[in-house]
Amino acid sequence: MPIGVPKVPYRIPGDEEATWVDLYNVMYRERTLFLGQEIRCEITNHITGLMVYLSIEDGISDIFLFINSPGGWLISGMAIFDTMQTVTPDIYTICLGIAASMASFILLGGEPTKRIAFPHARIMLHQPASAYYRARTPEFLLEVEELHKVREMITRVYAVRTGKPFWVVSEDMERDVFMSADEAKAYGLVDIVGDEMIDKHCDTDPVWFPEMFKDW
């Protein structure tokens, strides 16, 4: 059984022959990123750095972000979301598996009409959590106030990007709300369900999806 990152043959532009390179390096060259773990500082810096680099390299071609994450740190997730809104290329967000908590916030941050959930994906949203229960009383009060501000900001983003009233989103975020792909589309979290649209565009538009996926 192979150990480590799989290697695949890939011909670098300008080279005559293909060489064996890490799978993820091939994906990066095709402007395809993966968020497949809990959202922490390291993966946040990795993804945001790649987004900025790809934007500088080519400010027109789309970037594809595949998401299968249980969520994670609030500030780290917001950093990815803000980077997505800042870089010039459109960001496709594609949920496979689960996009929970801050991962659903990142899924929501994709370019409108370019947010996709695979048929069996699950999306979950809830209110931001904090570790204030470990803090002393003055720190507790300060953190609660800050958390309230962040919660209001995140709720407002959900409301604006889904088209739902603020109060509806606010009430929904009081508990863990799990949605199927179809329910997430009806809610406004994603625009497309399934991979039919990917297949359609791969056949008709050579720019729509990375070149390497056309032979799959």
Curated annotation (Swiss-Prot):
The protein's Enzyme Commission number: 3.4.21.92
Record-linked CDD domains: S14_ClpP_2 (cd07017)
Class of enzymatic activity (EC top level): hydrolase
UniProt cross-references to Gene3D superfamilies, sorted A to Z: 2-enoyl-CoA Hydratase, Chain A, domain 1 (3.90.226.10)
Subcellular location: Plastid, Chloroplast stroma
Known catalytic reactions: Hydrolysis of proteins to small peptides in the presence of ATP and magnesium. alpha-casein is the usual test substrate. In the absence of ATP, only oligopeptides shorter than five residues are hydrolyzed (such as succinyl-Leu-Tyr-|-NHMec, and Leu-Tyr-Leu-|-Tyr-Trp, in which cleavage of the -Tyr-|-Leu- and -Tyr-|-Trp bonds also occurs)
GO cellular component: chloroplast stroma
Quaternary state and interactors: Component of the chloroplastic Clp protease core complex.
Family from the record: Belongs to the peptidase S14 family.
Name this polypeptide is given: ATP-dependent Clp protease proteolytic subunit
Organism: Triticum aestivum (Wheat)
